Amino acid sequence: MTSHRAQRPSPDEYPSFYAGYVSQVPDGDVVEALIGGAEIAAALLHDLDEERGDHAYAPGKWTLKEVLLHCADAERIFVYRALRIARGDQTPLPGWDENAYAPLSGAGARSMDSIMDELESVREGSVTLFHGLPEDAWTRTGNANGKPITVRALAWITAGHLLHHLGVVQERYLG
């Protein structure tokens, strides 16, 4: 029997909005994909200077530092949802406004090193949670932002969200 964490979630396990994130994740064990995403981030973003971190590729767009803190914020929210649902909590979980969070993140006052440390720490916590889940938790369904979603889908969304943003960073901030 294949582990639930190695099975890509079916489209009925998550809102269609997240399909692009799920599709970013390579086939196989999603915990390994989470680890791989952290390695990609470290390789891509190591040794970037502060000027690069404070750069936005267009007026009204987030700076690189804001993008990275958005990734940390989103991951915390996805993983919090996964924890609640994995533990059988059926409380509907609210949505959140990423565009309201970014300007309040304090990204401009932080160093790239501190932001990278935070992103790495958040990812380590995510890996630890998902690695330790019992097999039956992966298929539990809860409600987030008014829509049904499974723990498995949240793991794949978590992995794919960072990969998506690393692609944007490569193309628009570093390219």
Residue ranges and their predicted role:
Residues E32-L44, Y101-T139:
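Acidic/histidine-rich alpha-helical segments that form the ligand environment
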Residues S16-E32:
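Short, charged, low-complexity loops and linkers
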Residues D27-A38, K61, K65-L68, M112-M116, ...:
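Amphipathic, non-membrane alpha-helical segments in soluble helical-bundle scaffolds
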Residues M1-D12, F17-G20, D54-E98, E124-V127, ...:
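Short, contiguous alpha-helical
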Residues L34-W62:
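A glycine-rich, hydrophobic loop/mini-helix early in the fold
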Residues P26, D49, P134-E135:
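Residues that cap or delimit alpha-helices
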Residues S23-D27, S105-A109, K147-V151:
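A short, mixed-charge helix-start or loop-turn motif at secondary-structure junctions
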